[in-house]
Every structure is written in C-alpha cells, then in structure tokens.
Regions:
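Conserved sequence/active-site signature of Rossmann-fold short-chain dehydrogenase/reductase
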Residues: 9, 79, 130-132
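Conserved Rossmann-fold NAD(P)-dependent oxidoreductase catalytic core, especially the SDR/UDP-sugar
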Residues: 56-102, 123
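NAD(P)-dependent short-chain dehydrogenase/reductase
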Residues: 117-159
Length: 159
C-alpha cells in the first residue's frame, strides 16, 4: 500500500503530481479516495473540497489514462439526512437521499457524478463518520461514553 498526498486545489499541480506518480510507480491497482472536507466556514467550500476536488481528480485520471482497477470513493451516510429516527431501522440502498447539510449535499453530488460516468470502475462506501487529524467530534463522543456521560446524536429528542 502506498499513499499519495495530492493537491486538489490546483488542477495543474494535481496533473503534474499524477504524472510524477505514474513515472515513479506506474499505474494504480486501486485508489481509495478519502480526501475531502468535513468542516468549512463557508458552505460553498464543501462543494469545492468534496465534489469539485473529486471531479477534477477523476477527470485528470481519465485524461492521463491512469484508471485504477477500482476507484473506492469514501462518501458518507450524511447523504440521507435524518432518516429512520423513529424506528431506527437500517438504511438501505433503495432509500432516497435527502441530505440536510452542505456536507451531505456535496457528498451526494460526488456520488451522482460517479454514477454518470461510463466505463469508470468505482464503488461507494458510506461510513457513519470519520475520525482523524483535525476531526475531534467522534473523539469527544467516545470520551463521553468512557466517562459514563449520556449523550444523544441527531436533531431532536425522541421519547
């Protein structure tokens, strides 16, 4: 497994980075595309950091003929918005996405873009949440649980 740190904010730089990767390593077997933004000051930045970055990445891969065997896109369950809050039944693939955040909308736009592509090998994963550098929300949740603090996630209290 190798990691590629790419600049999605500059299309020309991204293309140069991918060309360099191709020279040094050849093509890709698989790409796990988990880059993106989860917090932004301006709602438009979600589209830039999630949808447009993904789209430019894929367009550049296609232009440079660097398609992987499989492109794994890390999306989010947030594309569904608040769903099944009463009975908590599982979300399924046939459910209609109804994102209620700019983040969820940007992830859904990326999924819709992928679904429109012809002959592009992709799969979409929708994790419940992410945790890593600069993403502290889930750490706070786990810390609350470890201290036996009751908390609720969601948009309203259900009795």
């Amino acid at each position: 497994i190798s990691f590629a740190e790419l600049d999605f904010t500059d299309s020309d730089r991204l293309e140069e980075q991918l060309k360099q990767h191709k020279l040094e390593h050849g093509g890709w077997d698989y790409i796990i595309h988990c880059a993106g933004v989860t917090k932004c000051r301006d709602k438009a930045d979600f589209e830039i950091g999630n949808y447009w970055a993904t789209r430019h990445f894929i367009e550049t891969l296609m232009r440079l003929e660097m398609l992987p065997e499989q492109f794994i896109y890390i999306s989010s369950l947030s594309i569904f918005g608040p769903i099944r809050e009463k009975d908590y039944s599982p979300i399924c693939e046939q459910d209609t996405p109804r994102p209620n955040t700019a983040y969820g909308v940007s992830k859904l736009h990326s999924e819709e873009y992928l679904q429109k592509l012809k002959d592009f090998p992709y799969v979409i994963f929708r994790p419940t949440g992410v945790y890593g550098p600069r993403e502290k929300d889930y750490f706070l949740m786990v810390e609350s649980i470890s201290r036996h603090v009751d908390f609720a996630a969601g948009f309203r209290h259900l009795s």
